[in-house]
């Protein structure tokens, strides 16, 4: 091993030990200085990394909640997955104690997002099973913006049993983006807990009906895009989805329907 490589490893190890020994008071002090400086990107990103490697899970979550409440989009949740199983357990306990629905939705979404990154960890499946009942219970009463988050989260932690729920939202939800994200989440299941072949078999008719009947152009484009990823096709370019190019979307719709009806 070269000297430069040894130095790099030694530096990383020292950084890890430093972060593991960070106290709440030290993190609070750094946070206060960032507030005064209006959160310059480089320092904010470094602080976020330190939060994730520190043992101060409760303080980390406190900052995330402040960010949610103030709508500042400081992205403190980006490193929460670094807390591993301990972080998941903390969020599950917090979720069980939380009574405000909007906050429960945000916690469920954060849990699902973290678990999506941890799908190869041994705690993934068991943790998903704990979050799913809460997520599903929140879906019927949630307003559109919260429902969208929950539908996206369902794609990250759902299993074969959730195909029907997503299918219902795909075909009957009154919100166009909820319908669109349902298609995306069905596709996402193939990257998580459902085998692609099984998912293709169970969703082919759903996608065909949804794409055929969809009146909202953006939702239709997003459905086609999700379906082409799942079924390995190239019906529509990303640029056409982003720019909502009517002619290309309608052409892709015809191609998708023709394939899905086979």
Question: Each PLM stretch: what is its role?
Answer:
Residues 25-28, 45-64, 85-96, 117-139, ...:
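Amphipathic alpha-helical scaffolding segments comprising HEAT/armadillo-like alpha-solenoid repeats
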Residues 73-74, 89, 104-105, 109, ...:
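Alpha-solenoid HEAT/ARM repeat scaffold
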Residues 59-71, 104-115, 140, 180-186:
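HEAT-repeat alpha-solenoid elements in large eukaryotic scaffold proteins
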Residues 69-70, 100-102, 144-145, 175-177, ...:
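Alpha-helix N-cap/helix-start positions at coil->helix boundaries
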Residues 228-262:
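Eukaryotic acidic, Ser/Thr-rich intrinsically disordered low-complexity regions
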Residues 142-185:
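Eukaryotic tandem repeat interaction scaffolds
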Residues 112-116, 155, 187-188, 224, ...:
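Structural signature of alpha-helical solenoid repeat scaffolds
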Residues 1-87:
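N-terminal alpha-helical scaffold/docking segments in eukaryotic complex subunits
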């Amino acid at each position: 091993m070269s000297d430069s490589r040894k130095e790099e490893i030694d530096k990383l190890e020292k950084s890890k030990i430093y972060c593991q020994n960070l106290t709440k008071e030290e993190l609070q002090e750094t946070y206060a200085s960032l507030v005064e400086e209006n959160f310059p990107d480089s320092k904010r990103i470094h602080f976020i990394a330190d939060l994730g490697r520190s043992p101060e899970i409760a303080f980390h979550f406190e900052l995330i909640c402040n960010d949610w409440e103030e709508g500042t989009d400081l992205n403190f949740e980006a490193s929460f997955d670094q807390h591993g199983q301990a972080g998941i357990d903390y969020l599950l306990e917090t979720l069980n104690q939380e009574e405000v629905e909007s906050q429960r939705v945000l916690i469920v979404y954060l849990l699902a997002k973290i678990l999506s990154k941890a799908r190869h960890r041994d705690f993934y499946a068991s943790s998903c099973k704990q979050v799913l009942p809460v997520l599903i219970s929140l879906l019927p009463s949630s307003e559109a913006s919260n429902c969208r988050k929950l539908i996206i989260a369902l794609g990250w932690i759902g299993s074969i049993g959730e195909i029907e729920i997503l299918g219902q939202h795909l075909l009957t939800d009154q919100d166009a983006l909820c319908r669109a994200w349902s298609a995306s989440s069905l596709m996402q299941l193939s990257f998580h807990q459902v085998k692609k072949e099984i998912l293709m078999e169970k969703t082919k008719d759903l996608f065909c009906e949804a794409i055929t009947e969809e009146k909202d152009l953006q939702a239709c484009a997003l459905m086609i895009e999700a379906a082409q990823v799942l079924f390995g096709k190239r019906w529509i370019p990303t640029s056409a989805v982003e720019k909502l190019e009517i002619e290309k979307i309608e052409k892709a719709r015809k191609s998708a329907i023709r394939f899905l009806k086979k």
